[in-house]
Amino acid sequence: GSSGLISVPRV
């Protein structure tokens, strides 16, 4: 979910 920097699952 971040700006391509860190992958965080937006659930």
UniProtKB/Swiss-Prot annotation:
GO biological process: neuropeptide signaling pathway
InterPro entries from the UniProt entry: Periviscerokinin (IPR013231)
Tissue: Abdominal perisympathetic organs.
Keyword Transport in annotation: no
Location in the cell: Secreted
Modified residues (Valine amide): 11
Pfam families: Periviscerokin
GO CC term, one of those recorded: extracellular region
Keyword entries, A-Z: Amidation, Neuropeptide, Secreted
Protein's job: Mediates visceral muscle contractile activity (myotropic activity).
Family classification: Belongs to the periviscerokinin family.
Protein's name according to its UniProt entry: Periviscerokinin-2 type 2
UniProt organism field: Celatoblatta sp. (strain Blue Mountains) (Cockroach)
